[in-house]
Amino acid sequence: MLIPFSMKNCFQLLCNCQVPAAGFKKTVKNGLILQSISNDVYQNLAVEDWIHDHMNLEGKPILFFWQNSPSVVIGRHQNPWQECNLNLMREEGIKLARRRSGGGTVYHDMGNINLTFFTTKKKYDRMENLKLIVRALNAVQPQLDVQATKRFDLLLDGQFKISGTASKIGRTTAYHHCTLLCSTDGTFLSSLLKSPYQGIRSNATASIPSLVKNLLEKDPTLTCEVLMNAVATEYAAYHQIDNHIHLINPTDETLFPGINSKAKELQTWEWIYGKTPKFSINTSFHVLYEQSHLEIKVFIDIKNGRIEICNIEAPDHWLPLEIRDKLNSSLIGSKFCPTETTMLTNILLRTCPQDHKLNSKWNILCEKIKGIM
């Protein structure tokens, strides 16, 4: 059963609330099941942060359901250039988010369910949560062969991944979140989670590719709504709480004071890209010049998402050394992103001799450089 989460039926989840108590009026004795009415990845991730930072979960576990419009979510210690096709994401208007938990990269859309299990640090148990999901799936379709693995994934028929896991453990609280593939766009998923960038050297956490499958392909009755209700029922029975899914608005400051600032932080370039572990790119590409292919070599060091070292090598007869040196020096300290590179190269182009052939070569080189960003 869905219940709107409004000021008239708010819940006091803390005995010693660390935020203004205006957002929560009544006391929850055993636990709570929430569902976001938002499909914005940043707003929903902010709910996780808020609950983790502000709620006393002693004896009051929380299950949080949320779904996002098409988005790619990378782990806390991952490199987006290594994990996904950023150029395709920009073309398609797909959001990129970096979560605060570890783990690998996932694709979200409205055919995917996200589940977050909040507990105290002492009660944190990923395997128990996954077993709960398996029981819920078997309750609605006993013929399903779903098993939890040692890597805390859920496999369908022993080979198809339908759920991936990540977690965050704080000083006193913890959460485990996972996906559940119902009717996700598999073609889009595989295209977006395939990096086209070559020559990346990084110590960032790398995702492990897996075969995936939607539950709806196995049984067309297994819709997102059916699955969420099944998991909620099993969760309520396990924790002996009311089987009610309470709808929340993750932008409501009366319920979650300060939550919008958390969502804004998650959208910043400094968080999404700037938190990428230091990496380098050592690659090359070819350009056509007078019916022959010339090789352009590129070596770039990136730290905190900004170019620290830049060395672009091209034949002198194709592009003068002086111009290449200007390009190398101008990019140092800039964001490793096509928008800022476009701005810098346009400014630099104005200082170059107004020569049609030279400008054409310059544009070709700059487009190639932006293509690896």
Swiss-Prot record:
Chief subcellular location: mitochondrion
InterPro entries noted in UniProt: aa-tRNA-synth_II/BPL/LPL, BPL_LPL_catalytic, LipoylTrfase_LipoateP_Ligase
A biological-process GO annotation: lipid metabolic process
Disulfide linkage: none
Free-text tissue specificity from the UniProt record: Highly expressed in skeletal muscle and heart, moderately in kidney and pancreas, and detected at lower levels in liver, brain, placenta and lung.
Keywords, ordered alphabetically: Acyltransferase, Disease variant, Mitochondrion, Transferase, Transit peptide
Organelle targeting sequence: 1-25
Pfam families: LplA-B_cat
EC number: 2.3.1.200, 2.3.1.-
Span of domain BPL/LPL catalytic: 57-243
Binding positions for (R)-lipoyl-5'-AMP per the UniProt entry: Y107, R151, K161, T179
Signal peptide interval: none
Pathway assigned in UniProt: Protein modification; protein lipoylation via exogenous pathway; protein N(6)-(lipoyl)lysine from lipoate: step 2/2
A GO cellular-component term linked to this record: mitochondrion
Top-level lineage group: Eukaryota
Cellular location(s): Mitochondrion
Keyword Glycosyltransferase appears in the UniProt entry: no
Gene Ontology molecular function, alphabetical: lipoyltransferase activity; N-acyltransferase activity
Family of this protein: Belongs to the LplA family.
NCBIfam families reported for this sequence: lipoyltrans
Function per UniProt: Lipoyl amidotransferase that catalyzes the transfer of lipoyl moieties from lipoyl-protein H of the glycine cleavage system (lipoyl-GCSH) to E2 subunits of the pyruvate dehydrogenase complex (PDCE2). Unable to catalyze the transfer of octanoyl from octanoyl-GCSH to PDCE2. In vitro, it is also able to catalyze the transfer of the lipoyl group from lipoyl-AMP to the specific lysine residue of lipoyl domains of lipoate-dependent enzymes but this reaction may not be physiologically relevant.
Disease listed for this protein: Lipoyltransferase 1 deficiency: An autosomal recessive disorder due to a defect in lipoic acid metabolism, resulting in severe lactic acidosis and metabolic decompensation. Variable clinical manifestations include delayed psychomotor development, severe hypotonia, dystonia, loss of head control, coma, bradycardia, and pulmonary hypertension.
Name the UniProt record assigns to this protein: Lipoyl amidotransferase LIPT1, mitochondrial
Protein species of origin: Homo sapiens (Human)
Encoding gene per record: LIPT1
